[in-house]
């Protein structure tokens, strides 16, 4: 791995999203609905639904909200959302991937384009930056929840079929082939680990430092994208400040 650790960034983003909790729950409800609609309402037989439900619980989404979204998918609702990925560059030439669930592709494309252009970025064509990222399974064990040391965790991760382990003061971060994600997650939970995070994500092959004079503009762009109701995930190739 490139050493591009995600957990610190995820924690920071989660804290920032606490003030936008209603919007976060709305987006998660949409993801749960689509996962249940396409793969069935039983998470034991629908790994995508289980993953999104885990994500919702990690965001402290109420159980009633989760159940409501699943029941809606089981009903006669003809509501449909298209999965769209947008690609572009942030200020400083940093690659950005934007994943959206939308019921109006024209509206979302326009909103995403405006977010880029108003904040010093540029929206690119399909394929312009996607090749710079790899799809990976990503799991996190909070070190405060386990007595296992790094050697033991590494052994368990390898036995489970994981690809890589990164260690920090507060977490073990595990990366897997996306096809092995469910098997690795289940094996680690069976081994007694409590997962603080478990999701499929996009990891940059290389990172780009954000120039000091572009950092504020870069932050505004990411905020504008994440504030969009249709945007599910934003991935960047920005280097951490300590890289």
UniProtKB/Swiss-Prot annotation:
<dbReference type="Pfam" id="PF20772">
    <property type="entry name" value="TACO1_YebC_N"/>
</dbReference>
<dbReference type="GO" id="GO:0005829">
    <property type="term" value="C:cytosol"/>
</dbReference>
<dbReference type="InterPro" id="IPR002876">
    <property type="entry name" value="Transcrip_reg_TACO1-like"/>
</dbReference>
<keyword id="KW-0238">DNA-binding</keyword>
<dbReference type="InterPro" id="IPR049083">
    <property type="entry name" value="TACO1_YebC_N"/>
</dbReference>
<keyword id="KW-0805">Transcription regulation</keyword>
<dbReference type="GO" id="GO:0006355">
    <property type="term" value="P:regulation of DNA-templated transcription"/>
</dbReference>
<dbReference type="GO" id="GO:0003677">
    <property type="term" value="F:DNA binding"/>
</dbReference>
<comment type="similarity">
    <text>Belongs to the TACO1 family.</text>
</comment>
<protein>
    <recommendedName>
        <fullName>Probable transcriptional regulatory protein LJ_0904</fullName>
    </recommendedName>
</protein>
<dbReference type="InterPro" id="IPR029072">
    <property type="entry name" value="YebC-like"/>
</dbReference>
<dbReference type="InterPro" id="IPR026564">
    <property type="entry name" value="Transcrip_reg_TACO1-like_dom3"/>
</dbReference>
<feature type="region of interest" description="Disordered">
    <location>
        <begin position="1"/>
        <end position="22"/>
    </location>
</feature>
<dbReference type="InterPro" id="IPR017856">
    <property type="entry name" value="Integrase-like_N"/>
</dbReference>
<dbReference type="InterPro" id="IPR048300">
    <property type="entry name" value="TACO1_YebC-like_2nd/3rd_dom"/>
</dbReference>
<dbReference type="Pfam" id="PF01709">
    <property type="entry name" value="Transcrip_reg"/>
</dbReference>
<keyword id="KW-0963">Cytoplasm</keyword>
<keyword id="KW-0804">Transcription</keyword>
